[in-house]
């Protein structure tokens, strides 16, 4: 069997995956500290799980990690699109297949024997995560450079609405990561495949 066929995850995918982990952890933890400086919901994030110590420090961490996320994301999309992996791994996808796989998962009958193949639930979840990160980036641009992106700001309903979109997008990503980590705990060889490639 050739190495190309045997490999489940190519090197570029593994590298971008782990860079995403670093970027998302930094962005979420520093973002929580930024939120605490001016909350719009009736709660605060515990300081112990935030990053930056104070607003200025949190902003520095956030701005540094946003570049990592952006560059890494472009590399990820480039390789996924031009290698054909995006179409091969995530499509076709139908609502019927998603519902069927969801019901199987709830019954504990969803198979994950072939790590090289994504089931419909995985395809939908990963496509959701990609779309969610795009929404987070676009709303983040409004928060970072509101004057330079007036059309985007208005499309999102204004600066304050963009803050909420950004926070809700982050919350959805954290929920995705939580489910993703739980699934990895249930099928540990997926972690080995993401480290070694097979």
UniProtKB/Swiss-Prot annotation:
Task: Show the Pfam families listed in the entry.
Answer: Ni_hydr_CYTB
Q: Which organism is it from?
A: Azospira oryzae (strain ATCC BAA-33 / DSM 13638 / PS)
Q: Where are the transmembrane segments?
A: 12-32, 63-83, 124-144, 167-187
**Does this entry carry the keyword Transmembrane?**
yes
Give the membrane topology, semicolon-separated if more than one.
Multi-pass membrane protein
InterPro entries from the UniProt entry: Cyt_b561_bac/Ni-Hgenase, Di-haem_cyt_TM, Hydrogenase_cytochrome
Question: Function of this protein?
Answer: Part of the YedY1-YedZ1 system that may repair oxidized proteins containing methionine sulfoxide residues (Met-O).
Determine if Membrane is one of this entry's keywords. Answer: yes
Per the database entry, which stretches of residues form a coiled coil? none
Going by the UniProt record, its keywords in alphabetical order are: Cell inner membrane, Cell membrane, Membrane, Stress response, Transmembrane, Transmembrane helix
User: Which BP terms from GO are recorded?
Assistant: respiratory electron transport chain
- Give the source's domain of life in one word: Bacteria
Q: What is the protein named? A: Putative protein-methionine-sulfoxide reductase subunit YedZ1
Which cysteine pairs are covalently linked by disulfides here? none
| GO cellular-component term (any) | plasma membrane
Q: Where is the protein found, in the record's own terms?
A: Cell inner membrane
Q: Which gene encodes it?
A: yedZ1
């Amino acid at each position: 069997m050739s190495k190309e066929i045997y490999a489940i995850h190519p090197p570029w995918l593994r590298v971008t995956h782990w860079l995403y982990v670093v970027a998302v952890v930094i962005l979420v933890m520093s973002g929580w500290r930024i939120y605490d400086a001016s909350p719009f919901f009736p709660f605060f994030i515990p300081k112990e799980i935030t990053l930056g110590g104070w607003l200025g420090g949190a902003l520095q961490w956030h701005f540094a990690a946003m570049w990592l996320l952006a560059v890494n994301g472009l590399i990820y999309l480039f390789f996924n699109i031009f290698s054909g992996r995006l179409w091969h791994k995530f499509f076709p996808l139908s609502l019927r297949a998603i519902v069927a796989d969801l019901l199987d998962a709830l019954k504990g009958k969803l198979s994950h024997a072939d790590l090289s193949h994504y089931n419909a639930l995985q395809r939908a979840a990963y496509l959701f995560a990609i779309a969610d990160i795009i929404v987070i980036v676009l709303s983040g641009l409004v928060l970072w450079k509101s004057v330079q992106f007036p059309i985007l700001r208005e499309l999102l309903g204004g600066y304050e609405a963009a803050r909420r979109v950004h926070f809700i997008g982050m919350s959805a990503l954290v929920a995705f990561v939580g489910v993703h980590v739980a699934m990895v705990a249930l099928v540990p060889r997926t972690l080995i495949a993401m480290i070694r490639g097979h």
